Amino acid sequence: MICTTGIGISISANKVKGIRCALCSDPLSAKMTRLHNDANMLAMGAGIVGENLALEIVETFLNTPFSGEERHSRRISLIEEV
């Protein structure tokens, strides 16, 4: 999802049950949110990241699997209970 900053859409998206939306402005954030939080939606700000960087962020997000580590799985379970 894209808006000017990405903040509002990420907040709104996270109100939907089952959505774990992460606001990312760099590839490392995209990688870590997939690895550790199993984020299933990406938010970006068009006024924050340029086109080439946005493509790199999306590619990283889509190509990074969830780590499956127990501590990360527990975290996701706690998030889902909220």
Regions found by a protein language model. Give the residues of each.
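Glycine-rich phosphate-binding loop
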Residues: 1-16
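Structural motif
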Residues: 2-3, 24, 44
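Short, flexible micro-motifs
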Residues: 9-11, 21, 48
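Short, structured coil segments at secondary-structure junctions
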Residues: 17-19, 37
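Short hydrophobic/aromatic-enriched beta-strand-loop microsegments
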Residues: 19-26
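C-terminal binding/interaction regions
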Residues: 27-82
